[in-house]
Amino acid sequence: MRVVVDEIVFLFLKEYKIPLSNKLESIIENLKMNPHMYAMIADKENARHFIINGVDFGYFIEGDTIVISNCKFVKSKWRLRVKWE
């Protein structure tokens, strides 16, 4: 399994100066072993999410690749929207 962090997620973390490197690394290692480990989004088998330090990350599974494609603050109405192709 390969895990890809989308550029928009990287820029979101950098802009808000959110240090998650150690926790995100452990989550990525868990995703490589069991990609279906976290909760589904809207009953879609391949769209899932996890939360670290008040930031909700969404990812989807596409073949042998896991793409962390969006994120938002848990207690905020603002969201980062990404088109899925």
Where are these regions (language model features)?
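Generic cytosolic/nucleocytoplasmic N-terminal low-complexity/intrinsically disordered segments
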Residues: 22, 45, 74-76
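A short, surface-exposed loop/turn module that caps and links secondary-structure elements
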Residues: 26-51
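Arg/Lys-rich, positively charged N-terminal/basic patches that mediate binding to nucleic acids
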Residues: 1-27
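Generic alpha-helical hydrophobic packing signal
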Residues: 4, 27, 32, 71-73
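Short histidine-centered beta-strand/loop micro-motifs
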Residues: 13-15, 40-42, 60
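Enriched for short, Lys/Arg-rich terminal
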Residues: 2, 51-56, 60-85
